[in-house]
Structures are given as structure tokens and as C-alpha cells.
């Protein structure tokens, strides 16, 4: 009988905790209007931010293309501020 009582108390405590957690989650989640305003404020929606991301991607790709065109293994370069031909980067 004692084991059944402890099991019921444990189930009640866990169920109560889950109930409180569910209620708090429902209170914290934003409503539909707040979700829409948050989506409008995201950085990806800003055209300047998108242009900057495109430019950064272009620069990375150009750098990778230049690195692929050389015979130097840049992974073994000791001084990263100096390019393979001795010039400063």
C-alpha cells in the first residue's frame, strides 16, 4: 500500500509540474501579431543586410578561387600575414 501511495504522489507531482510548465509556455509564446512584427524586424528582411551578405559571399568565393589557382598549401603556412611570395597580406 505504501508503494502505491508513493507512486501516486510521484505521478501527481510530475503531472503538476508538467501542467505548470504547459501553462507557463502558453503564457510566454508570442501571439500571431507579435510573430508577424518579429518576422518584419529580422535582419534577413533588410535589403542592406542582404546586399552585404551577397558581397561577403562574393569575396569569400573570389578568395577560394584565388587559393585554388595557386600551388601553395596554405594550411602549412607559418606566417598568415605574409602570402606565399613573401609579400605582406
Swiss-Prot record:
Q: Which residues lie on this side of the membrane: Mitochondrial intermembrane?
A: 29-89
GO terms under biological process: ATP biosynthetic process; cristae formation; mitochondrial electron transport, ubiquinol to cytochrome c; mitochondrial respiratory chain complex III assembly
User: Where exactly are the transmembrane stretches of this chain?
Assistant: 8-28
Name its cellular compartments. Answer: Mitochondrion inner membrane
Please give the residue ranges for the topological domain Mitochondrial matrix: 1-7
* PTM annotation, UniProt: Probably cleaved by OMA1 under mitochondrial stress conditions.
Principal subcellular localization? mitochondrion
Checking Pfam families in the record gives: UQCC3
Membrane topology label: Single-pass membrane protein
Which InterPro entries does the record associate with it?
UQCC3
Task: Name the cystine pairs.
Answer: none
Q: Does the keyword Transmembrane helix apply?
A: yes
Q: Segment Mediates lipid-binding: which positions? A: 23-80
User: From the Swiss-Prot or TrEMBL record, what is one GO molecular function term?
Assistant: cardiolipin binding
Q: Which UniProt keywords apply?
A: ATP synthesis, Membrane, Mitochondrion, Mitochondrion inner membrane, Transmembrane, Transmembrane helix
User: What are the annotated GO cellular component locations?
Assistant: cytosol; mitochondrial inner membrane; nucleoplasm
Q: What does this protein do?
A: Required for the assembly of the ubiquinol-cytochrome c reductase complex (mitochondrial respiratory chain complex III or cytochrome b-c1 complex), mediating cytochrome b recruitment and probably stabilization within the complex. Thereby, plays an important role in ATP production by mitochondria. Cardiolipin-binding protein, it may also control the cardiolipin composition of mitochondria membranes and their morphology.
The entry describes its oligomerization and partners as:
Associates with the ubiquinol-cytochrome c reductase complex (mitochondrial respiratory chain complex III(CIII) or cytochrome b-c1 complex). Interacts with UQCC1. Forms a complex, named COMC, composed of UQCC1, UQCC2; UQCC3 and UQCC4; mediates MT-CYB hemylation and association with the first nuclear-encoded complex III subunit UQCRQ.
Q: Which family does it belong to?
A: Belongs to the UQCC3 family.
Name of the protein in question: Ubiquinol-cytochrome-c reductase complex assembly factor 3
Q: What is the name of the gene encoding this protein?
A: Uqcc3
